[in-house]
Structures are given as C-alpha cells and as structure tokens.
UniProtKB/Swiss-Prot annotation:
Ranges that cross the membrane: 3-23, 48-68, 83-103, 121-141, 159-179, 192-212, 234-254, 261-281, 286-306, 340-360
Catalytic activity: UDP-N-acetyl-alpha-D-muramoyl-L-alanyl-gamma-D-glutamyl-meso-2,6-diaminopimeloyl-D-alanyl-D-alanine + di-trans,octa-cis-undecaprenyl phosphate = di-trans,octa-cis-undecaprenyl diphospho-N-acetyl-alpha-D-muramoyl-L-alanyl-D-glutamyl-meso-2,6-diaminopimeloyl-D-alanyl-D-alanine + UMP
Entry protein name: Phospho-N-acetylmuramoyl-pentapeptide-transferase
Subcellular location: Cell membrane
PANTHER family xrefs: PHOSPHO-N-ACETYLMURAMOYL-PENTAPEPTIDE-TRANSFERASE, PHOSPHO-N-ACETYLMURAMOYL-PENTAPEPTIDE-TRANSFERASE HOMOLOG
Gene Ontology MF terms: metal ion binding; phospho-N-acetylmuramoyl-pentapeptide-transferase activity; phosphotransferase activity, for other substituted phosphate groups; UDP-N-acetylmuramoyl-L-alanyl-D-glutamyl-meso-2,6-diaminopimelyl-D-alanyl-D-alanine:undecaprenyl-phosphate transferase activity
Annotated keywords: Cell cycle, Cell division, Cell membrane, Cell shape, Cell wall biogenesis/degradation, Magnesium, Membrane, Metal-binding, Peptidoglycan synthesis, Transferase, Transmembrane, Transmembrane helix
Highest taxon of source: Bacteria
Stored InterPro entries: Glycosyl_transferase_4, PNAcMuramoyl-5peptid_Trfase, PNAcMuramoyl-5peptid_Trfase_CS
Signal sequence, renumbered to the chain: none
C-alpha cells in the first residue's frame, strides 16, 4: 500500500516543480496554442499560451510509478514491489496515445494548422496503439490463469457474456478511441479536463485497492468470498491510477484559470487512453461510462449537435462541445468549469456507489 501513497505524492511533486520549467521551455521555442477563429471571443486572449503540457504529467506519471516501486523495495525488501505486466501495459497505452497527440500538437504549432494531423493519419495512429494494447492485454497469464484483460464484458466485474478475442479487440478499440476523444473534446476550458481526470483517477485508485483486498486469491480469508475479484495485478493498477491522480493534480495548479499551459492533444489523448486501459484491466468497462460521465456527456453533445444539423439543418446547442454552449449563454469560464467538476464528482460518487453495491449484494 505504501507504493500507492508514494506514487501519488511523487507525481504531485514532479508536476508542481516540473511544469513551470516546461512552460519556460515551450515559451522560448514559441510553442503556443493556436486558437480557432470560430470559438468564443473570450478565447482569443489564450492565443500563444504554451501547449503540449501533457508531456509534464506523462513523464511524471511514469517516473512516479517506477520511483514508488524503487523506494518501496528499498524500505521493505520483503515486499514484491516490482513492475507488473498490467501496470506496464496501461502505462504503454498512455505513452502511445500521448505520442499520437504530440504529433498532432506539433503540426498545429509548426505548420500553424489548427486541425493538426489529418483525420486519417490521426485515426491510424490511435488504431495502431489501441490494437497493440488490446492484443497484448490477452497475453501473459499469471499463475491463476488471469490475463490483464478478459474476453468477457464487464460492468463491476465480468459477467457471463463472452465475446471472443476478435470482438474484444474491436470493443477495446471503441473504448480507447471514445474515451481519448472524449477527454480531448472536454479539454476546451482552463482546468476542466485536468480536474475531472483527478476525480476519476482517484476513483480507480480506490477500485484497485478494493479489488486487491477482495481478490479471489485470498478467498479463504474474505468476509464475502462470493464477491471476490479475478483481476490481475489490481494493486499495481492502483499505483498507476494514484500516480496519474497526483500528476494531474500538480499540473492543475498551472492549468487552472488563467492557464499558464495547456495539456494539448498530447495530454488529452493520453489521459483518455489510460482511463480506458484502467477500465479494461480492472474489469469495469461499462462502469467507466459512469465514472467518466462528464467525458461521455460532452462527447454526446457533439454527436447530438452534428446529427441534428445533418438531419434537420438545425443546431440543438449554441455551440458544441457542451461547455461552449454555456459560455455563449453568458456563464463565465470559471463558473462552467466548477459546475462541470461538480457533475463529474457526482458521476464518481454514483459509480463508486454502484461498485460497492455490486460487491455487497453479490454473495
């Protein structure tokens, strides 16, 4: 359990200290945000703000993960605190999606092209990373036969519907692409996506700890053995989630309004990808839609807006994604962000409540 605390604290410290150094570096190179002309007028003042800030919390998360394990092993050599395949796989997904986002950001900055990577190239990059994760997640079973992912669909735990490896890859790709682009759409206001991510990664830290304590490997000592969890490396998933929570919290210090740096696609694609990876490996795939409810809500606002305009020629919202609709209604940016954080907090509370209820009622 110590490594979970170490990971969160180290991640927090690294982004608090490291982000301003990244801000200076990006500003010196002129890597500032390109603002679209069709957005809210208030956003024009953000033009030139350093972007690609996701580099800070991606590096901090990876460093916090390994440092936490090294410190834990040093303090207590009897504890097996080495990296696990599940933890490395989820971190690899984060880094891979972050690289796709980095290329997108780089093209926006260097080419001064607001849309960044061509849609086809961006999709190919995301698919490549997602397929690699999905295929590898069904390999390398532990001594109980558990692989990082399962071909059964899951809500709070796996349920009986097995979809097979091919459909699983398709399902995993859908989750990764949907959530990575959902976080990307959410990242339109200072601190919005970062703060929401802190909350959801906090939830996955709790889930990982709970699944470790209630693991089927310890069935003889459990108070409710009928509700145990067959999850590979749940404690290590909690370490990853804690490192992410701490790193995002430290980054939020610099990303909150008025933002000194933006995460860019580098950060948003990485956060969405790693969130989907945590859900897949913790067997909470459908629960992710509730825990990450704000990302789903904002994504659906875009789907509704585009669908309505194509079918009827009319728009449902003044502007999509949803946060900009409220800006155009006269809400201040800070008001929108705080209220959306509250919505995300409610989603996390409901999701964790369902998670606990599933354990308590499954005898």
């Amino acid at each position: 359990m110590k490594q979970i605390l170490f990971a969160g604290v180290i991640g927090l410290f690294l982004t608090l200290v490291g982000t301003p150094l990244l801000i200076k570096l990006l500003a010196r190179k002129g890597y500032g945000q390109y603002i679209r002309d069709d957005g809210p007028r208030e956003h024009a003042s953000k033009r030139g703000t350093p972007t690609m800030g996701g580099i800070a919390f991606i590096l901090a998360t990876v460093a916090a993960y390994f440092l936490a394990k090294g410190i834990t092993s040093y303090l207590d050599p009897d504890i097996d605190a080495g990296p696990t395949f599940s933890g490395l796989l989820v971190l690899g997904l984060m880094v891979g999606m972050g690289l796709v986002g980095f290329l997108d950001d780089y093209i926006k900055i260097v080419k001064r092209r607001s849309l960044g990577l061509r849609a086809r190239a961006k999709m190919i990059g995301q698919l490549t990373v997602g397929i690699a994760f999905a295929v590898l997640s069904l390999q390398f079973a532990d001594n109980r036969g558990n692989t990082p992912a399962s071909t059964k669909l899951s809500f709070i735990t796996d349920f009986g519907w097995t979809i097979g490896p091919v459909l699983f890859v398709v399902w995993a790709l859908f989750m990764i692409l949907a959530m990575s682009n959902g976080v990307n759409l959410t990242d339109g206001l200072d601190g919005l996506a970062t703060g929401a991510s802190v909350l959801v990664f906090g939830a996955y830290t709790f889930i990982g700890v709970w699944q470790f304590q209630e693991s089927c490997a310890n069935a003889l000592t459990l108070t409710n053995p009928g509700a145990c969890y067959e999850v590979r490396d749940p404690l290590d998933l909690a370490v990853v989630a804690s490192a992410l929570m701490g790193s995002c919290l430290g980054f939020l210090w610099w990303n909150t309004s008025p933002a000194k740096i933006f995460m860019g696609d580098t950060g948003s694609l990485a956060l969405g990808g790693v969130l989907a990876g945590l859900a897949i490996c913790s067997r909470t795939e459908l629960l992710m839609a509730i825990l990450g409810g704000l990302f789903v809500l904002i994504t659906m606002s875009v789907v509704i807006q585009v669908g309505s305009f194509r079918l009827t020629g009319k728009r449902v919202f003044r502007m999509a994604p949803l946060q900009h609709h409220f800006e155009l209604k006269g809400w201040s940016e800070v008001l929108v962000v705080v209220r959306f954080w509250i919505i995300q907090g409610i989603c996390v509370i409901v999701g964790l409540g369902l998670f606990y209820a599933g354990w308590a009622t499954d005898k």
